[in-house]
Amino acid sequence: MTTNFYTAFPTLGYTAYPQFAFAAATTAPSLTSATTSSTTMAPMAPNSESGRRAGRRERTSFNRGQLDQLEKVFRETQYPDVHRREALAKAINLPDGRVQVITVWFKNRRAKDRNNKKMDGVHPGSTSSRSSNGSPHNESKPDTKSLGIHIPGTPEFNAHSAAKYEANSAVLSQLQQQQQQQLQQPKSELEDSKPLADTKYDSTQSLLPQAQAAAYASYATTAPYPYNYNSYFPSNFYYQQYGSNDYTPNITAYSPL
């Protein structure tokens, strides 16, 4: 016989198990507190964005008149005191509490002035400097008169060109006259006018070959005279040249006396 499980073990309330009822009662409020905390933390995101935006400083832009006043004070002193900065803020109509902006402007202006001096030291010819708003100042042009440079179109340039042309024309006419005189002059006069080559004695050249050639020429022109060679050799000095093949040389000439 099968018994029904649900009829054998009926459902029991929390009164039968008091420990489980306490646990259920404690867990329910925690869930509600978590949900409420999540709902309360959600609207804080826009407040943080507004806080970051409020921490940013607003950029101050000066007009031309204000920049002229600042540059004037900067030329007088690069480190104005507090009273001077406050008076300058009132002069350029800055709102109250913006004196710090003038301090920052002077700091940036001093840094820019140092950079300009460094650039002038590296490039001495460049004297261009710019103001705080980026507009260039008037550049000082070099004195061309002291350098002796004449700009085309000026009276100095025209006078210099005319004098140079006259000098070149005078030199050219003088050269043409010399060429004409040389063409008209006869050849004999030209040869006489040429300088004679100087004969120089060369110590390294020997005079012995010249003396030998002269002596040989004089010897060849004179008639030879007979010379008796037999006086130096005895009559029986030579071998017998004719006769039989078997011959004995005559050695009597070599025998001792």
UniProtKB/Swiss-Prot annotation:
It comes from Caenorhabditis elegans. Expressed in ASE and AWC chemosensory neurons. Expressed left-right asymmetrically in the embryo, in the grandmother cell and the mother cell to the MI pharyngeal motorneuron but in neither analogous precursors of the e3D neuron. This is Homeobox protein ceh-36. GO terms for molecular function: DNA-binding transcription factor activity, RNA polymerase II-specific; RNA polymerase II cis-regulatory region sequence-specific DNA binding; RNA polymerase II transcription regulatory region sequence-specific DNA binding. Its main location: nucleus. Pfam families: Homeodomain. Interacts with sox-2. SMART domains: HOX. Residues 55-117 bind DNA. Belongs to the paired homeobox family. One of its GO terms (biological process) is chemotaxis. Keywords: Chemotaxis, Developmental protein, Differentiation, DNA-binding, Homeobox, Nucleus. It is found in: Nucleus. Residues 33-49, 123-137 have a biased composition (Low complexity). Transmembrane segments: none annotated. Residues 33-63, 113-156 are annotated as: Disordered. Probable transcription factor, acting as a progenitor identity factor regulating the development of lineally-related embryonic cells including glial, excretory and neuronal cells. Mediates chemosensory function of ASE and AWC neurons. In ASE neurons, required to diversify the fate of the ASEL neurons from the ASER neurons. Acts cell-autonomously to establish a neuronal left right asymmetry, possibly promoting asymmetric expression of the helix-loop-helix proteins ngn-1 and hlh-2. In cooperation with the transcription factor sox-2, required for the differentiation of AWC olfactory neurons. The keyword Manganese does not apply. InterPro entries: HD, Homeodomain-like_sf. GO terms for cellular component: nucleus.
